[in-house]
Amino acid sequence: MLVDGSTPGNDMRYIEKKVEAARNFANKLWNATRFVLMNLPEDFTPGLPSEDKLDMSDKWVLTKLNQVAGAMTDNLDHYEMGLAAAKINSFIWDVYCDWFIEIAKPRLNSGDAEQADTARRVLVYVLDKALKLLHPFMPFVTEELYQALPGSAETIMTQEWPTVDEAHNWPEEEEAFE
């Protein structure tokens, strides 16, 4: 994630703190993926549950994922690599890891099989899409993590770029959640 914060046409200086931040981000992503994988049953098959099973936090994270996918696509279309990298970094660190995984933990351990299954499905779905969005910036790490996901294809490189899915857009839930 060394391109995070870079601007088109400008040289970047080597900054040790930026290297440390990139290492910390990769470690955070690696640990988040390990957490998700260790909470999946062996017979898990990926796929989002029906909308009526999603709770407010699920709708919130899916809305945020939609927003970051749309914004990153626009940034990359305009060759704004630094902005795109910053957006996926912020989404993975701040939204997915710091909030959604923490919110999902009680559901995973609640004893309610349906709630736990819904949480697992959303965790895997969002992680899959986030890895695809991050892939241009961290190809080796994202490939390794993607291969560990259940139902993953041969390689992340041949997968479709995540696009905005209007069916996963809940602005009311997003506003109420925040």
Predicted feature descriptions by range:
Residues 1, 99, 145:
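Residues that scaffold the ATP/ADP-binding catalytic core of kinase and kinase-like folds
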Residues 1-54, 150-156:
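Catalytic adenosine-cofactor/nucleotide-binding cores of aminoacyl-tRNA synthetases and other
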Residues 3-6, 17, 24, 81, ...:
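An acidic- and aromatic-residue-enriched active-site/binding cleft used to recognize and process polar
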Residues 12-36, 86, 90, 120-143:
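Structured ligand/cofactor/substrate-binding pocket environments in proteins
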Residues 24-37, 56-68, 85-106, 160:
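Core structural elements
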Residues 43-73, 102-178:
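Acidic, turn-prone loop/beta-hairpin segments
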Residues 76-83:
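Short helix-adjacent coil turns
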